[in-house]
């Protein structure tokens, strides 16, 4: 990538970069100390202060449904897929209502509110000013009609009427903010974007498509070469700082970092001053300009120096942008990140959760990081524990999820408890982000609990989190089953299986087979064995229902054998025998252990005919232990002379078939 025209200088240290701002802050603080203190006569309360006070008196109810579903408790979802479908359906209905009201506002003019409440009345989203005029252009800009605004601007120029600088800057704001694309409405997507997605899906193999995080510019779209924003900017007879800053921010937002720095160079050549938002955008784009880590940092420092020279005071987002860019600066970023935090404190700028999130990103790169470097999370929690935060940076919502990932990689349950306590403090739970981020946070927390805690504590959290706050995926339920196995609490498996069905994971093959393996591994007391048998029958019914489910379960030799063994141990001989018949139908071969288990059940029931039928089944499968099976029947069962002859014939037929198969294999080798 071509380097911008900005001249970079070498930087020796960064501790005094923003000392100018520190001095200004101290000067203002000294001046303020001589001012008179004006004590207000009354305290101003927020409009929802009473509701907030009432909310603090109520703790979380793990049995209550999500607040989104309070209106329809009957339709409250029980699975993650139902949650997604319900929430999307509700939001779709709300957006559809907004669309109808916005499209036909004349049908909703009955104002019954006294006094008048403007927000309850429909907004007029259709243009009212006709013709080619600057007023019509302002209206299209206000309505966020990108294409119509550009067309109207061109018509004004062709008619010899140039819009004012203020109006042109507003148009430039609109085009740069949306990347010269129509904004995505509430219930519709741009036809061009839909076509791009469709073309991409047709040309790419979904199996070979890499699963990785994309840049923000890739999600938003790229900055097209010579788009309307650049064209209008070049057509402007006069430009002010706002014109340059708008174009720079748009280019940086949509991934055209090199162009953004070129425009910034033009801004400086015109002796104009950039605002703090523009510097923030350039700092975020700086790592994309340079290749080496030290060059990336030098460019960031150069921008900070320009802020000092242009008397632009940094804000919280400035320092967060520096920390976010430092995440791309390799090992050298650790010391620089701490210096950045010290600069924030010197300027009396309170860090936000995004600040600490970027700090974790700088110091913690993965589970293989040295232990001493990962203790930064403990120090962060020491500083922010017990505090209440508000949303001050869009990246604030990523802190809890990423911090819990650090706890999981470190397998530090105490840190996880401290983090969760912070999340429960005041209104901090409102900074969890969307449903995906919340589910990721609770999933990692529950995974760590299953690895590190006893089963009693795990079940306590299980009842508190599920399903009121978290719908576990199949991986989470597997972790719970492994925890039950480690603490030898297999008696809880029947109840957990009911939860698995309710949550909607009964069609996950790995999960179903893990349940069967745990139940069939050891012989349990009769009462528990009977419960296992009922669970095995329930699982068997899932394999038989194939028309009403999208993902049908297919019998494997292991699942067939486990269900057969569980039914035999539970005394359900008829059902167990039917399961043995399914082996041949499913083209599977029963194991020796399954046949021994079934023969033991036949011995308990003193059912000689069933034992002989089992030997006949083994002969049909040409199992190597058929002779031992027949010998065991003759020794352990009371057989008649006719039955003995039958068993001997079965042994002879098995021996002859075995010898013929071995001779054929020898001839094949010759």
Swiss-Prot record:
Give the transit peptide, as a residue range.
1-13
A single GO CC term for this protein reads:
mitochondrion
Where does this one sit in the cell?
Answer: Mitochondrion
| Biased amino acid composition, Low complexity | 653-670
Q: Where is this region: Disordered?
A: 187-213, 648-670
Q: What broad class describes the main subcellular location of this protein?
A: mitochondrion
The stretches annotated as PPR repeats are: 129-163, 164-199, 209-239, 240-274, 275-314, 315-351, 352-392, 396-430, 438-472, 473-507, 556-590
Renumbered to this chain, the Acidic residues biased-composition regions fall at 193-203
InterPro entries membership: Pentatricopeptide_rpt, PTCD3, Rib_mS39_PPR, TPR-like_helical_dom_sf
GO MF entries? ribosomal small subunit binding; rRNA binding
Q: What are its GO biological-process terms? A: mitochondrial translation; regulation of translation
Q: Tell me, what's a Pfam family for it?
A: PPR_3
Question: Which terms are listed as keywords in the entry?
Answer: Mitochondrion, Repeat, Ribonucleoprotein, Ribosomal protein, RNA-binding, rRNA-binding, Transit peptide, Translation regulation
Q: What does this protein do?
A: Mitochondrial protein that may have a role in mitochondrial translation.
UniProt record similarity statement: Belongs to the mitochondrion-specific ribosomal protein mS39 family.
What is this protein's name?
Small ribosomal subunit protein mS39
Q: Which organism is it from?
A: Xenopus tropicalis
Gene name of the encoded protein: ptcd3
